[in-house]
């Protein structure tokens, strides 16, 4: 999220088939992927298909008086639905859960929280009320409590390998960056990285909200992600359009 906020374009559109294009100067990558996008009636929540079992969820929240879209993932597993990140608040999170449960005819069983800012953790009360397991690092749980949120489980280590039905998931803490607790989520079967707010979109012109950032350590953390995941297919940033590993390189450029 931002203090000096860029106006970000919503990375979804009306129900139908829509292309998204990612162009990053750091690499040659210019990618167009056709995918289904489903929106709620008010346009505040959208889910965008990356493949059969992985969708991006995007909610429009407000920061410093401006509408800002925030991304997470919906994982359609054989044992239920798993979200990467909740949403800005309980109302949006509740509607998101109801939307995906209706779409996939499965319950949301688990959520992975990537850091303790409102756009990730704002729906913790709703998750607790619904008996949904909210996984996080111990540091994120500590910061959540400090910031007045319900605490997630705090069960994730620096590297944690999880399996939800037929879906393998790895969480990785690469070091400090956007926040001291930011993690990324890796889907090895699909080579998809959920970069959260550690990774900037192609349209980002600056680092955005650095109130809780560790700018001097951010580059090292991005490099740690690049070293660990050399075969990235798609990258989902915390805000803005989906791209490829070039988004990591673009983030490094912004940090120079």
Curated annotation (Swiss-Prot):
One of its GO terms (biological process) is response to antibiotic. Keywords: Antibiotic resistance, Hydrolase, Metal-binding, Periplasm, Signal, Zinc. Inhibited by chelating agents such as EDTA. GO terms for cellular component: periplasmic space. Substrate binds at residues 200, 209. InterPro entries: BcII-like_MBL-B1, Beta-lactamase_class-B_CS, Metallo-B-lactamas, NDM-1-like, RibonucZ/Hydroxyglut_hydro. Zn(2+) 2 binds at residues 119, 197, 239. The keyword Cytoplasm does not apply. Binds 2 Zn(2+) ions per subunit. Changing residue 110 to N: No change in activity. The keyword Hydrolase applies. Its cofactor is Zn(2+). It catalyses: a beta-lactam + H2O = a substituted beta-amino acid. Its EC number is 3.5.2.6. Residues 1-29 form the signal peptide. Changing residue 119 to N/E: Inactivates the enzyme. SUPFAM superfamilies: Metallo-hydrolase/oxidoreductase (SSF56281). Monomer. Confers resistance to the different beta-lactams antibiotics (penicillin, cephalosporin and carbapenem) via the hydrolysis of the beta-lactam ring. Benzylpenicillin is a better substrate than cephalosporin C and ampicillin. Belongs to the metallo-beta-lactamase superfamily. Class-B beta-lactamase family. This is Metallo-beta-lactamase type 2. It comes from Bacillus cereus.
